[in-house]
């Protein structure tokens, strides 16, 4: 996280990083009339949440169920996105798969 913070501060020293989602960081996003902000892969963020939920429930990595995925998506949409609404907040991208 420190290396990402140092790197992004070269573009925007006030950029906010999404805590706990270091593995989902993909770069920066430019917006007109705004400073660049941190960009994260939304699907990877959901995978991080699933891993966290598995750990809390003592599940094996191979175990996947649709309910757990649904809980992670719901938590992301209802909690994570709401935490990052101010200036310099990160953006979460859905990547195009060719």
Language-model segments: which ranges?
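C-terminal alpha-helical interaction appendages
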Residues: 1-98
């Amino acid at each position: 996280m420190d290396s990402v913070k140092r790197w992004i501060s070269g573009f925007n020293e006030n950029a906010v990083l999404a805590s706990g989602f270091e593995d989902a960081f993909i770069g920066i996003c430019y917006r007109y009339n705004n400073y660049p902000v941190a960009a994260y892969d939304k699907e990877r963020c959901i995978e991080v949440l699933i891993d966290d939920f598995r750990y809390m429930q003592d599940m094996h990595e191979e175990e996947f169920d649709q309910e757990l995925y649904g809980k992670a998506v719901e938590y992301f949409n209802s909690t994570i996105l709401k935490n990052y609404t101010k200036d310099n907040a990160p953006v979460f991208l859905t990547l195009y798969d060719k």
